[in-house]
């Protein structure tokens, strides 16, 4: 359960803007602010069951989006490739290293 919550908290950064403001606020309060269902319910003026339903449905949609789009997976692969480039850079001649620095800077901006 904890592992799934950590994964969803990470995936929020990639997909939360695709949801309406209310769903995003409830889901962020749960995963990012670590509020209880009761605390969120009181703040949003809905029942705890309503909060649970929103969080469950939003989580399912986020996992579906990641399965289909793979944005978090792509970001992870990009970061791994950048780390590998940075480690290789130091073993190359200075001129080549400078060119690789330009590529790394461009990739970090994407």
Where in this protein do the model-derived segments appear?
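Short, Lys/Arg-enriched N-terminal segment that forms or immediately precedes the first helix
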Residues: 3-15
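Short amphipathic alpha helix immediately N-terminal
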Residues: 21-33
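Hydrophobic positions on the alpha-helical face of helix-turn-helix-like DNA-binding modules
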Residues: 26, 40-41, 51
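Helix-turn-helix DNA-binding motif, specifically the short coil turn and the N-cap/start of the second
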Residues: 47-48
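Residues within the DNA-recognition helix of helix-turn-helix
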Residues: 54-57
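C-terminal flanking helix
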Residues: 59-66
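Intrinsically disordered, low-complexity basic tails/linkers immediately adjacent to helix-turn-helix/homeobox/MYB/SANT
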Residues: 68-94
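Generic L/I/V-rich hydrophobic alpha-helical segments across diverse proteins
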Residues: 82-85, 97-100, 104-107
């Amino acid at each position: 359960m904890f592992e799934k919550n950590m994964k969803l908290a990470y995936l929020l950064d990639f997909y939360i803007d695709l949801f309406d403001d209310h769903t995003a606020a409830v889901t962020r309060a749960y995963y990012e602010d670590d509020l209880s269902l009761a605390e969120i319910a009181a703040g949003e003026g809905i029942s705890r069951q309503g909060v649970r339903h929103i969080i469950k449905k939003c989580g399912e949609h986020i996992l579906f989006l990641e399965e289909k789009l793979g944005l978090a997976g792509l970001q992870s692969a990009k970061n791994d490739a950048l780390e590998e480039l940075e480690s290789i850079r130091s073993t190359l001649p200075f001129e080549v290293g400078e060119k690789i620095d330009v590529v790394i800077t461009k990739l970090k901006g994407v």
